[in-house]
């Protein structure tokens, strides 16, 4: 069995979008810890291939890859937790949908990082 890919719909909770963007921009700035967080999450078996904001107030759609052996429940717990895209703040509602790659003859949305 291979990695599982998910599309995650992130909806901002009422009045929380601005706080999230401020936190995200700070994290992605030089010295903000973004690269370290990506490395730690990858080590845990979670990798975000892309984040795609529709508007500044949401939603944001992300493509995540999850290492083999990690359940959907464990992924949801990660996404909702302190290491997930909400930065440990109560700002996002995260709807995680696994992508059935068998429907597209095994094609994945991105080249897998876990083999």
Which stretches of residues belong to each language-model region?
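Short S/T/G/P-rich N-terminal loop/turn motif that feeds into the first structured element of a domain
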Residues: 1-59, 65-77, 95-115
